Regions:
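Active-site segments that bind and position negatively charged phosphate/pyrophosphate groups
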Residues: 1-88
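C-terminal charged capping/lid subdomain of soluble metabolic enzymes
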Residues: 79-133
Length: 133
């Protein structure tokens, strides 16, 4: 991304700010799904950093929902220039040096079952059904 290549690029920074604003508008206009639910459950229960938790969880939630939301996945793939939205987002995170695992954020492996239990306690809208298996 241009802002990574040149952090002083005012146009790139302006476009990033506008994109962030659009994301906020979307959050106020749509139902939250699996990604947001998992981030709040995991971040809150294990005291993980908010933005980094979103960065790690998003590709996995997208992969889970891709079959139920193929148009959204295709739009993300087109925007990021990948074969599918999930892999394109993972590649972008890698190029940016973003965290790639919950372990790197401090989540213990022993917390996975607890996180799964918490995530299914209060049903959330999601394009694909969520079940604890």
């Amino acid at each position: 991304p241009a802002i990574v290549a040149n952090p002083q690029d005012r146009e790139a920074r302006s476009e990033a700010l506008y994109g962030a604003w659009l994301c906020g508008v979307c959050l106020g206009s749509v139902g939250m799904a699996l990604h947001h639910k998992l981030c709040h459950v995991i971040g809150g229960a294990f005291d993980l950093p908010h933005a980094d938790t979103h960065t790690v969880i998003l590709p996995y939630a997208m992969a889970y929902n891709a079959k139920a939301a193929p148009h959204a996945d295709a739009a993300i793939a087109r925007t990021l220039g990948g074969r599918d939205g999930t892999s394109a987002l993972i590649e972008l995170a890698g190029r940016l040096g973003s965290p790639r695992s919950l372990k790197s954020l401090g989540m213990p492996e022993s917390g996975i079952d607890r996180a799964a239990d918490l995530a299914v306690q209060n049903p959330y809208w999601n394009p694909r059904p969520i079940e604890r298996t």
